[in-house]
């Protein structure tokens, strides 16, 4: 048996670019999500401004059970949040919080859980296929938006 893993990815688009280019917002998102997950920040948050050719902000904190990261892309108005933990947490609370805090509509917030096997080397192809299908859906939605 391997250590339990809880890994959720939240991607949102169609946000106000000015909102996403805010270091204080990213800092508060990291701190608030750690509290929502009932975990303690033991390193960070580290907040870094993007480059002119790739504007946005990245934030990262180490929590007592793993990490939380955020990447904003202010140009296209997108944000990616990744929470990886060895302790269970309620992803719906995080989803609800992000919807409210980022002022994003439900149709523009995509999230999924990465499922890990109970035994090393025993990934379920169905679970991987689901994640792949969801990622393809997101790519299609993005390409439709850009067209």
Residue ranges of each PLM-predicted region?
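Polybasic/polar functional segments that serve as interface/processing modules
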Residues: 1-147
């Amino acid at each position: 048996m391997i250590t339990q893993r809880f890994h959720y990815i939240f991607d949102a688009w169609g946000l106000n670019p000015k909102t996403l280019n805010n270091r204080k917002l990213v800092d508060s998102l990291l701190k608030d999500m750690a509290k929502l997950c009932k975990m303690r920040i033991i390193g960070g948050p580290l907040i870094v401004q993007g480059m002119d050719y790739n504007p946005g902000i990245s934030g990262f904190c180490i929590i007592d059970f793993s990490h939380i990261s955020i990447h904003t892309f202010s140009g296209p108005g997108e944000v990616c949040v990744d929470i990886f933990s060895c302790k269970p947490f309620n992803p719906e609370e995080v989803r609800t919080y992000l919807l409210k805090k980022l002022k994003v509509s439900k149709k523009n917030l995509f999230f999924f859980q990465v499922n890990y096997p109970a035994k090393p080397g025993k990934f379920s192809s169905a679970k991987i296929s689901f994640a792949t299908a969801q990622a393809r859906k997101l790519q299609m939605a993005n390409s439709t938006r850009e067209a």
